[in-house]
């Protein structure tokens, strides 16, 4: 059964919650930095528990190599860390979680190959794919197989078009709408330029929704400039048009790699508007050889920040395990595993069930659970696979995120 490709309710919720998101109840996490090293006793307990309750096999798909490797590895790490935590606490009613990540290099065809490899491994539930185009491609296969799919970060509307698919992140239209509302309601600027990647569903989808809501907010789009994956190193033309048009704010619904180049080139042109991004901007402070002072004052909407008290334990555990600070993709995947755990408990799933039977059990269970995660408190899902949670606005101040 196909779902309706709509997200109006989510967009309305996000808009209503933006003003109050800074005061929301902290999300709960059970991560602890001291758990980074598993003791022999704990490993023995896990083995014994797995023998008694069995193992739930969760596949993970994302770009582990190539330009998008930062995202795919974060998703794989977030899933692994959550599974380790759950297993050390006794699993899911004694059932252990085993994760296995496969590389899709951010390529739809290779993502299908990764999916088939995980099926051969015995995958029963899928956490992924990480990015939208591969997620859409794999989604068709997962629907045919009746495989339960929860994508941590596939934000295109089509990623959850079928009734077996759910997501943790916000959908693209919701991010665009919420960004325009935030800019308008907080009177950040009136003259707006947009620089977006027309070759990706992510950037194009956010941009389209932003433009529609900007009109409602009385924002004037003075420049609307595109680039593609084949022309993402020189942004002189786009920046010149934005500067000449008197843009007070430049909206960047793009990933942080290109954003870091734009910030450097804008600085060289002595063009200093407010720069505003979405969740794909998360990670800009970790770009190799990037002068992070150029990101000072940059704003973005994201449901996760490592500087929040509620994220501290997870961040410490992640750094101890992987030697790098987590980004939103890691947090999304971590929450995806805990959503699977809650739904499995709700549905009474056991390890000896087939992937199809597990999918049939989890679909209704997902609409009955609520979790306090890293990316939202009291998160719930509707039958269209969309999460209900509040975004958060952050600003980079002195090289760190500061909640707004």
Residue ranges, per PLM feature:
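C-terminal motif of bacterial Sec signal peptides marking the signal peptidase cleavage site
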Residues: 17-20
């Amino acid at each position: 059964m196909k779902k309706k490709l709509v997200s109006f309710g989510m967009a309305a919720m996000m808009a209503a919650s933006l003003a109050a998101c800074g005061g929301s109840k902290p999300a709960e996490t059970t991560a602890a930095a001291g758990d980074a090293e598993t003791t022999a006793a704990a490993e023995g307990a896990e083995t014994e528990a797995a023998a008694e309750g069995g193992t739930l096999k969760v596949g993970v798909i994302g770009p582990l190599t190539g330009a998008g490797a930062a995202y795919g590895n974060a998703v794989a790490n977030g899933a692994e860390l959550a599974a380790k935590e759950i297993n050390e606490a006794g699993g899911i009613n004694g059932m252990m979680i085993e994760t296995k990540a496969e590389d899709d290099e951010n390529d739809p065809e290779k993502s299908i190959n990764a999916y088939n490899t995980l099926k051969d491994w015995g995958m029963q539930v899928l956490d992924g794919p990480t990015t939208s185009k591969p997620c859409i491609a794999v989604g068709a296969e997962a629907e045919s197989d009746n495989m339960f799919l929860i994508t941590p970060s596939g934000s295109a509307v089509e990623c959850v078009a079928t009734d077996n698919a759910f997501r943790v992140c916000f959908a693209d239209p919701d991010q665009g709408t919420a960004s325009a509302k935030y800019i308008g309601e907080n009177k950040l600027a009136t003259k707006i330029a947009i620089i977006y990647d027309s070759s990706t569903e992510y950037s194009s989808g956010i941009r389209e929704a932003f433009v529609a809501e900007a009109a409602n907010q009385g924002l004037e789009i003075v420049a609307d400039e595109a680039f593609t994956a084949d022309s993402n190193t020189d942004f002189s033309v786009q920046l010149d048009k934005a500067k000449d048009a008197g843009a007070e704010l430049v909206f960047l619904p793009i990933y942080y790699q290109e954003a870091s180049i734009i910030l450097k080139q804008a600085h060289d042109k002595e063009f200093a508007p407010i720069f505003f991004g979405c969740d794909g901007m998360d990670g800009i402070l970790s770009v190799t050889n990037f002068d992070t002072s150029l990101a000072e004052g940059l704003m973005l909407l994201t449901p996760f920040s490592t500087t929040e008290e509620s994220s501290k334990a997870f961040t410490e555990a992640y750094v101890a395990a992987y030697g790098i600070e987590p980004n939103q993709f890691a947090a999304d995947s971590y929450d995806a595993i805990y959503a699977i755990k809650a739904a499995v408990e709700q549905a009474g799933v056991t390890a000896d069930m087939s992937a199809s039977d597990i999918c049939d059990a989890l679909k209704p269970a997902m609409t009955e659970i609520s979790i306090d995660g890293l990316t939202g408190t009291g998160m719930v899902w509707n039958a269209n696979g969309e999460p209900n949670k509040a975004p958060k606005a952050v600003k980079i101040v002195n090289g760190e995120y500061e909640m707004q």
